């Protein structure tokens, strides 16, 4: 059976934004908005022949396996869905990792120094970062976010980046005698990132009257479903439309 998925309006907009002159895109969408399907749609749009998807939880990765089935990728597309620990072990054993698109799911849990070091060793053409709540360490994990998703940070040096964007406070135990307390101006900072799709913008699109992506509501079934397995998958992935 051939399946066609109708993207939500914000997802279609994200696919368009992936054409920007940037090495990647970050999707800060709330839970249930369809980040998984959107990331796969962008990968398809990029005509990726090899995709690596990583998260640190197997339960989350199992959801990706289910979503991939809906996207009708060509048979010659290789999709690797693995934990960061598995990929780190591959690198330790001397394997070279490469792909067309790297998808890092749940950035807030995937931005440790060890994980970021792994991303540097994965040769790729494009990166997609996903999270509903990306901020950790009071925002300090946005420096590796820039480096990982966009290929560089502004400024590119970590110390200069912190001085530029951070509200620094005195710390007698630090070499520089100061430490990061919080963003100096988060709104200004985030608005200048190369390709960061903010949740506020996504919600505006989702709640627009002309949007086809209203929150999906399932009403009591009055007729027995002809294909209950497909209906269950439809609900799990929170799809707008699935057609033959």
Q: Residue spans of the language-model regions?
A:
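N-terminal pre-P-loop "Q-motif" helix
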Residues: 4-21
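Conserved helicase/translocase motor-coupling segment
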Residues: 204-244
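Conserved helix-turn-beta segment of the N-terminal RecA-like "Helicase ATP-binding" lobe
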Residues: 48-51, 58-79, 149-152
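Conserved helix/coil segment N-terminal to the catalytic DExD/H
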Residues: 80-101, 112-118
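Walker B catalytic acidic pair
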Residues: 105-107
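Walker A/P-loop
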Residues: 22-42, 131
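Conserved P-loop NTPase motor "coupling/switch" region that bridges the ATPase
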Residues: 101, 118-207
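Hydrophobic residues on the short alpha-helix immediately C-terminal to a glycine-rich phosphate/catalytic loop
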Residues: 18, 38-46, 145
């Amino acid at each position: 059976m051939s399946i066609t998925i109708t993207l939500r309006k914000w997802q279609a907009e994200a696919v368009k934004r992936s054409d920007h002159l940037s090495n990647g895109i970050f999707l800060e969408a709330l839970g249930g908005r369809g980040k998984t399907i959107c990331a796969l749609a962008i990968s398809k749009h990029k005509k990726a022949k090899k995709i690596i998807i990583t998260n640190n939880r197997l339960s989350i990765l199992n959801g990706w396996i289910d979503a991939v089935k809906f996207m009708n990728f060509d048979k010659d597309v290789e999709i690797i869905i693995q934990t960061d620990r598995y990929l780190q072990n591959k690198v330790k054993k001397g394997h070279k990792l490469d792909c067309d698109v790297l998808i890092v799911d749940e950035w807030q849990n995937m931005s440790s120094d060890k994980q970021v070091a792994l991303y540097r060793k994965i040769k790729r053409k494009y990166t997609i970062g996903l999270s509903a709540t990306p901020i950790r360490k009071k925002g300090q994990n946005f420096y590796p976010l820039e480096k990982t998703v966009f290929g560089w940070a502004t400024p590119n040096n970590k110390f200069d980046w912190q001085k530029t964007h951070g509200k620094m406070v005195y710390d007698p135990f630090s070499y520089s005698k100061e430490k990061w307390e919080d963003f100096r101006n988060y709104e200004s900072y985030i608005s200048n990132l190369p390709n960061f799709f903010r949740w506020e913008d996504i919600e505006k699109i989702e709640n627009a009257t002309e949007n086809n992506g209203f929150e999906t509501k399932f009403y009591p079934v009055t007729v027995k479903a002809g294909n209950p397995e497909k209906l269950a998958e439809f609900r799990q992935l929170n799809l707008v439309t699935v057609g033959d």
